[in-house]
UniProtKB/Swiss-Prot annotation:
Coiled-coil intervals, chain numbering: none
Name of a matching Pfam family: SAM_MT
Gene: rsmJ
EC number: 2.1.1.242
Principal location listed in the UniProt entry: cytoplasm
Stated name of the protein: Ribosomal RNA small subunit methyltransferase J
InterPro entries: 16SrRNA_methylTrfase_J, SAM-dependent_MTases_sf
CDD domains on file: AdoMet_MTases
Source taxonomy: Bacteria, Pseudomonadati, Pseudomonadota, Gammaproteobacteria, Enterobacterales
Entry binding sites for S-adenosyl-L-methionine: 101-102, 117-118, 153-154, 171
Length: 248
């Protein structure tokens, strides 16, 4: 995949080169999307819209730390949707990991989460955040045990995962309604990079074959069910819906 690769002063150019090889990235100075290695972390920037700022993964501080400490905990919608209750913590495969937010919430509550991400730039950002999280004295010990990343397309990888998880979680990109200059900066940068997941309908069947207890699909409230298959149950929030499917 082509992206503009930049190394800020103080960062290690050798590390950027290794990163490019690992994720099979080629540098294109004309590309609108830039992957920037700073002394602190790896960032994604949209070069023609610098005001959007940088996207990066940070499990240690910022919004994710705040959500872990002060969020709804087991009362969070995603926790209820995957079936967390009492002492039960399902083993989860997050087949559309993105920046790992929902996976982190589940891991912080005690679930083991195996994340799949097929886009190499997104996988590189997620891996960078994970590696920094693994080194943190507070969250590192449980993060290493509970959150792992596999760079692969779920369309093919879901057939090979072993052992089978109790829950498969899907949150495919869905086109936003036009009104959204309101759409968060992150989604704008993301959609420039990966577009919408036009082949996401193909994930439902292999996910249902893999999960032993349930498949959970996160959808915007205005979106039709994935693959137009009616869910067996659903839970709703202000702007989203968690569709729940039984295994097949």
């Amino acid at each position: 995949m082509s992206v503009c690769l930049l190394c800020e002063e103080g960062a290690d150019p050798g590390a950027l080169s290794i990163l490019a090889q690992r994720w099979q990235l080629t540098s294109d100075d004309e590309a609108l999307m830039a992957l920037v290695l700073t002394p602190e972390r790896l960032e994604l920037r949209k070069r023609d819209e610098p005001k959007l700022g940088a996207i990066y993964v940070d499990f240690v501080s910022g919004t994710m730390a705040h959500r872990r400490k002060f969020g709804g905990g087991r009362g969070e919608a995603v926790a209820k949707a995957v079936g967390i209750k009492g002492n039960y913590r399902p083993d989860v495969v997050d087949a559309t990991a993105g920046l790992g937010r929902d996976a982190f919430v589940l891991a912080s509550l005690g679930c083991r989460v195996r994340m799949l991400e097929r886009n190499p730039v997104v996988a590189a950002l997620l891996d960078d955040g994970l590696q920094r999280g693994y080194q943190d004295a507070e969250i590192g010990p449980w993060l290493r045990e509970r959150m792992t990343l596999l760079h692969a397309s779920s369309l093919t990888a879901l057939g090979d995962i072993d052992p089978r998880p109790e829950v498969v979680y899907l949150d495919p990109m869905y086109p936003h309604k036009q009104k959204s200059a309101l759409v968060k900066k992150e989604m704008r940068v993301f959609q420039s990079l990966v577009g919408s997941d036009d082949d996401a309908d193909g994930l439902l069947e292999p996910a249902r074959r893999l999960a032993t207890k349930r498949v959970v699909v996160k959808r915007p409230d205005y979106a039709p069910p994935l693959a137009n298959v009616q869910a067996h149950a659903a839970s709703t929030t202000k702007s989203h819906r968690f569709d729940i499917y039984m295994p097949v």
